[in-house]
C-alpha cells in the first residue's frame, strides 16, 4: 500500500526526534507540517540546490534564525546554528515525486539527536512518503 498525503499528517504528529518537521511540494506549498515557515524563507530553502557555493556561503534562514550549511549533496543540504551540545541542526531533503518534480522535507533537531540520526531519518521519510506523491 502506497503512503498517501493524509499519512503525512499522521507522520508529522508521530515523529518525535525533530523539533520541526514539514513537507513541501515543488511550488513551496505545505503538504504537512508541525509549523508554518515564512514563504520567502521557504523559497530560498527550496532553492538551496541552485548554486552550491552560494548556499554554503550564505547558509539557510528559518524563522529568522541563521543556520550554517556544512553539507551539500544532490539530495541533501544540512547544517546547524550554535555550538555542539547547545545548538540546533537543520536538514533539507529533496526527492522526485511521481510527476518528476521535486518534493521536499525540512527538519530541525536538537541535542541529543545528532545529524547522523536526524538526516538519515529525514532521507528515509522523504524516500518513503514523497516519491509516491
Q: Where does each model-flagged region fall?
A:
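Non-catalytic interaction/Regulatory regions outside core domains
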Residues: 1-133
Amino acid at each position: 500500500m502506497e503512503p498517501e498525503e493524509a499519512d503525512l499528517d499522521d507522520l508529522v504528529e508521530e515523529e518525535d526526534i525533530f523539533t520541526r518537521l514539514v513537507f513541501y511540494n515543488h511550488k513551496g506549498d505545505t503538504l504537512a507540517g508541525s509549523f508554518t515557515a515564512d514563504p520567502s524563507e521557504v523559497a530560498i530553502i527550496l532553492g538551496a540546490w541552485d548554486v552550491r557555493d552560494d548556499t554554503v556561503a550564505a547558509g539557510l534562514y528559518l524563522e529568522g534564525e541563521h543556520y550554517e550549511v556544512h553539507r551539500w549533496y544532490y539530495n541533501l543540504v544540512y547544517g546547524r546554528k550554535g555550538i555542539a551540545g547547545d545548538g540546533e541542526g537543520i536538514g533539507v531533503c529533496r526527492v522526485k515525486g511521481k510527476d518528476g518534480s521535486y518534493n521536499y522535507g525540512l527538519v530541525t533537531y536538537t541535542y541529543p539527536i545528532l545529524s547522523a540520526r536526524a538526516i538519515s531519518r529525514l532521507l528515509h521519510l522523504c524516500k518513503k512518503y514523497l516519491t509516491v506523491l
